[in-house]
Amino acid sequence: VNPIPKKVSVVSTGVANVASVLAAFRRLGVEPQEISRPEQVEQAEWLVLPGVGAFAAAMRAIEERALAGALRARIEAARPTLAICLGLQLLASSSEESPGVSGLGIWSEQIVRLSAERVPQLGWNRVVASANSRFLETGYAYYANSFCLQTEPAGWTASWTDHEGKLVAAVEQDAVLACQFHPELSGPWGERLLANWLGGGRC
């Protein structure tokens, strides 16, 4: 993968370990910066919203830092944004994990608990890329999730995976990409995905 000189900003709210995300971009020749203020979200050239842990704690951290409005405005304007794992789930209206807690509401869909016997989904699983995907190719990605998005939001392009039932692996619209899996932990395949996102599409 060719190094791509871009300014990448990673949202750091204290509830997600961003070290592996930062390291993944450094491997691409990009020096990312951690940010935590709304004006930084607005000004970011390329923005990453990582997420690990509980839906409610992540939304509380976002709201305490007054980031929700800036994140919504950025995504609705289709500015380059990558949401990872819980980051994807935060774009929904709500989650079964945290009843009564609102998400960012980019989509009307609710995040639901995996119906599989094996929960969480932990490890490698196949991603079947949409033929219309700008960023993904079919391959294997690393997952760590107990909740998921099961339906494709209107106006978005979904790629899929199967964990004792079909679920959304990633959704994209213009320069916005949200992945349930961890591209930063998905080896060369994940590295290509990050490079594709930075480059505006598959090479």
Question: Where are the regions a protein language model picked out?
Answer:
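N-terminal beta1-alpha1 ligand-phosphate binding loop
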Residues: V8-V30, P183-E184
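Short acidic low-complexity segments
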Residues: P32-Q43
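Short glycine-/small-residue-rich Rossmann-like dinucleotide-binding loops
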Residues: V15, G51-G53
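Cysteine-nucleophile active-site neighborhood
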Residues: G53-L122
